[in-house]
Amino acid sequence: MNLNNLGGYEDSNRTLNNSLNYPTQKALSPSLKNMNYQDFLSITEREQPEALASGNTAINTVVSVTGATLSALGVPGASFITNFYLKITGLLWPHDKNIWDEFMTEVETLIEQKIEQYARNKALAELEGLGNNLTIYQQALEDWLNNPDDPATITRVIDRFRILDALFESYMPSFRVAGYEIPLLTVYAQAANLHLALLRDSTLYGDKWEFTQNNIEENYNRQKKHISEYSNHCVKWYNSGLSRLNGSTYEQWINYNRFRREMILMVLDIAAVFPIYDPRMYSMETSTQLTREVYTDPISLSISNPGIGPSFSQMENTAIRTPHLVDYLDELYIYTSKYKAFSHEIQPDLFYWSAHKVSFKQSEQSNLYTTGIYGKTSGYISSGAYSFRGNDIYRTLAAPSVVVYPYTQNYGVEQVEFYGVKGHVHYRGDNKYDLTYDSIDQLPPDGEPIHEKYTHRLCHATAISKSTPDYDNATIPIFSWTHRSAEYYNRIYPNKITKIPAVKMYKLGDTSTVVKGPGFTGGDLVKRGSNGYIGDIKATVNSPLSQNYRVRVRYATNVSGQFNVYINDKITLQRKFQNTVETIGEGKDLTYGSFGYIEYSTTIQFPDKHPKITLHLSDLSNNSSFYVDSIEFIPVDVNYDEKEKLEKAQKAVNTLFTEGRNALQKDVTDYKVDQVSILVDCISGDLYPNEKRELQNLVKYAKRLSYSRNLLLDPTFDSINSSEENGWYGSNGIVIGNGDFVFKGNYLIFSGTNDTQYPTYLYQKIDESKLKEYTRYKLKGFIESSQDLEAYVIRYDAKHRTLDVSDNLLPDILPENTCGEPNRCAAQQYLDENPSSECSSMQDGILSDSHSFSLNIDIGSINHNENLGIWVLFKISTLEGYAKFGNLEVIEDGPVIGEALARVKRQETKWRNKLAQLTTETQAIYTRAKQALDNLFANAQDSHLKIDVTFAEIAAARKIVQSIREAYMSWLSVVPGVNHPIFTELSERVQRAFQLYDVRNVVRNGRFLNGLSDWIVTSDVKVQEENGNNVLVLNNWDAQVLQNVKLYQDRGYILRVTARKIGIGEGYITITDEEGHTVQLRFTACEVIDASNAFISGYITKELEFFPDTEKVHIEIGETEGIFLVESIELFLMEELC
């Protein structure tokens, strides 16, 4: 069983360290053989490393500084701030000693590296200067707070702020001199703490000090930059120092652990509160908790021989727990064993702590969990439970002891005194040895009395073994401690921000885990597992249940998705989140910039005093890592939500306009104007009637400005395909919607199409008269969702984007009001959370998951005669396509300059050259086509065809006409192109020729335009399209096609057929009257084709004269074998020949 399985513990008989094998200890020297016990103890005590009794001034000072800092987090009030400065200066710059020098010395001792004297002296001198100026600033600040309207106090505090700030900016690099970053690290962290506290004052008081808003913003942005910079520096060099001390022996681990413990106290604890100096994020007093765990030294006398004892890695893996949820010690069950003395004349027997197991609770939980056994229970002589239930153990006094043998020593702990706020608990194997090991030497209190000013509480005990050659392993306990701020209850206050670390959960999701934190978060992190459920926190609400709270979560991830907060198993908050980094590693490797905040716009009230808070993820973009640092509760007043709506709307309205409110900002879209109007609509008219009315007038004015700058006609889609307005033209498959959750006004719904030649489309041409030369215009709009939606803007050429946008703006269950109408106010939070056009991604020419879109078009010179204009087109050409979009606009973006100007001039020149080439080409085709058409008709009025005109000749003329390019736009075949007038003129003459051809033809459906209609056919006959013509196909020798027609007797007719034979055999067309008079046309594959008579390769036209003797005649089409294709069969009077 894993003792750090955070989902819950079980009782276990697991014994730690029973199988460790260590090298046999070397025999003691003869002088030690003859030494008595007290002499031996004197030697072992002299062998203790210098840092053993580390209850020194440096550590004492930093725990006091940390305590003072924790009490002044956020914006606690003016008196707290001045008292903070007063206390800090007293701690860091006392009159009787140089604390900063002791900071350096403490770390120098731990890492055995001295700071070069010049760098040391320079840093100390500059620190002295900072202290002097901080004292002056503190006094100036206090004077101003007492006399805020006095110009003299204002001037003085401003001057002292700027001087002190400049000194910090100048001196901070001296506290990170290259090569000495680690021994200077405590100095750096403490100085950074003061600088960030100072910069907070600029944001808090800058407006009262008459700083410009730019100056306040500059200082605030500098503070945010320094929070990140200082945090990352502290963690980087802490890790560097720790890795430097990595070793292989027990003694090396002792020093390694001391460095870790003391640098957590001196550096990382302070770095953990840096973010809370941000007065905009933490705008009131803030309660936070340091949940990291530190380990005091093993309770043991020094090992006399380095060859015995566990290795470095064994110590780290055995004594140090893996990351876990915060737990609280409830009971130690301790086993006592005995070492028999070598001689009672020298020393007594040792009754020692040989094994134990730990029972504990997690935050605000009654369930008790018990670990397996640490140590060895075999041969124990007694055991007992030592209860600490609800009793913070803030200090331990222990009696480490040793039994001396001629060739070995056996170590053990005879007794431990546990000091608790509710009383003491005493473990006593015996009482023959003194209580010499005091935990407050390593974890000092923040003053006297200790039971009130203690800084840490005992939370757990592990154990290690020291090997002897002849005896079983001795068990040495190691105590772990949490900071006092990590209290058992997760109290949520009515008057300050509560920051609850995620590791204060009492239950994790099945696959969620606790991972090592990066160092600047004050503890470890919770990492999500394979599903969305992260875990549960129990809280205690120390406020009336009517109190409202804002909620935010600090997290790090490279995925996007939705973060859900449940209270008492009821979903209460939902919000989309974006990735904070592109790539992410393990929790310990994260930097300050890896983290972001999910902040909910909706406030909450707790349903009871002890709610269960569940954190849950959904809609994740992939299965990557997600880390939770903390969840925060910010108390707000009862009208906070309405006030927030008002302030949000006011800010949104102000951002719509340029200075003077004469125009809209360039980046303001028509969609944004609509969304701002929704914000205004959501303002409470009861609480803020005047403000709402004023904002409504402004947003209506903004909408008028939006209409006025939009070059598109009919932006609300009221007159599509109107003959009265030259606006939008569209196909079938378009529906106009009105007023839903996303769009306030009209919007478009496109459906897919069954035929790519006839897409669903909507287009409009912007007239040249509306445009300015050498100007850029932008097409903008908003898409709720789409697939295969193509957007075009066209002038010299077409700019084209395919827009695929996920339907991810709103939850599955949409909020509605009591009338069943869209509740836009409730839905607004979902729209706020979704990405804008800047968050889009382009792949293979497809713009994905960007709800806002924009396409540029640059204009060159203006020519009103050409009226090139700008074409705007939307279309869907697939069956699966769909789109829901609106707020379309084309607006002026600004002049085209620089490279863009050169590019548009080049485009225009290229377009004009192509147009000239097209004009020349078209003129030549027009001449040919006109001549071909003139040859078809018998007169200038095109009222009769010449008698010898064949179908092939008409089709040939049509082919010439169809070779005219740019008759229709390439991007949409229904939109006329530059050659449309010419093409139309010629096409109408072609159609006239076909009409006359059909009129004179006695054979019904002789061109098979209506398939097999009017023909009697066998089942294997078909009609297929070929090169724009319908062709009759006979595939078998027994296929037969028949038609009876009625003619004039004694009149002459011409039978004219255009056909093609494929393969052997022949095809034929026979005409027979009722008296048996028959004529026949035959076609074979080997006939020589008259090029002048051919239309398509292989097709030829033949004709013959026929004089019927009866009115009724019979026409038959057939073949002997192979394939026979008939394009046209014509029978007409030959009266024109007479």
Curated annotation (Swiss-Prot):
<dbReference type="InterPro" id="IPR048645">
    <property type="entry name" value="Cry1Ac-like_dom-VII"/>
</dbReference>
<dbReference type="InterPro" id="IPR038979">
    <property type="entry name" value="Pest_crys"/>
</dbReference>
<dbReference type="Pfam" id="PF21463">
    <property type="entry name" value="Cry1Ac_dom-VII"/>
</dbReference>
<dbReference type="GO" id="GO:0005102">
    <property type="term" value="F:signaling receptor binding"/>
</dbReference>
<keyword id="KW-0800">Toxin</keyword>
<dbReference type="GO" id="GO:0030435">
    <property type="term" value="P:sporulation resulting in formation of a cellular spore"/>
</dbReference>
<dbReference type="Pfam" id="PF17997">
    <property type="entry name" value="Cry1Ac_D5"/>
</dbReference>
<dbReference type="Pfam" id="PF00555">
    <property type="entry name" value="Endotoxin_M"/>
</dbReference>
<comment type="function">
    <text>Promotes colloidosmotic lysis by binding to the midgut epithelial cells of Coleoptera.</text>
</comment>
<dbReference type="InterPro" id="IPR036716">
    <property type="entry name" value="Pest_crys_N_sf"/>
</dbReference>
<dbReference type="InterPro" id="IPR008979">
    <property type="entry name" value="Galactose-bd-like_sf"/>
</dbReference>
<dbReference type="InterPro" id="IPR005639">
    <property type="entry name" value="Pest_crys_dom_I"/>
</dbReference>
<dbReference type="Pfam" id="PF03944">
    <property type="entry name" value="Endotoxin_C"/>
</dbReference>
<keyword id="KW-0843">Virulence</keyword>
<dbReference type="InterPro" id="IPR041587">
    <property type="entry name" value="Cry_V"/>
</dbReference>
<dbReference type="Pfam" id="PF03945">
    <property type="entry name" value="Endotoxin_N"/>
</dbReference>
<dbReference type="InterPro" id="IPR005638">
    <property type="entry name" value="Pest_crys_dom-III"/>
</dbReference>
<protein>
    <recommendedName>
        <fullName>Pesticidal crystal protein Cry7Ab</fullName>
    </recommendedName>
</protein>
<dbReference type="InterPro" id="IPR001178">
    <property type="entry name" value="Pest_cryst_dom_II"/>
</dbReference>
<dbReference type="GO" id="GO:0090729">
    <property type="term" value="F:toxin activity"/>
</dbReference>
<comment type="similarity">
    <text>Belongs to the delta endotoxin family.</text>
</comment>
<dbReference type="GO" id="GO:0001907">
    <property type="term" value="P:symbiont-mediated killing of host cell"/>
</dbReference>
<dbReference type="InterPro" id="IPR036399">
    <property type="entry name" value="Pest_cryst_cen_dom_sf"/>
</dbReference>
<keyword id="KW-0749">Sporulation</keyword>
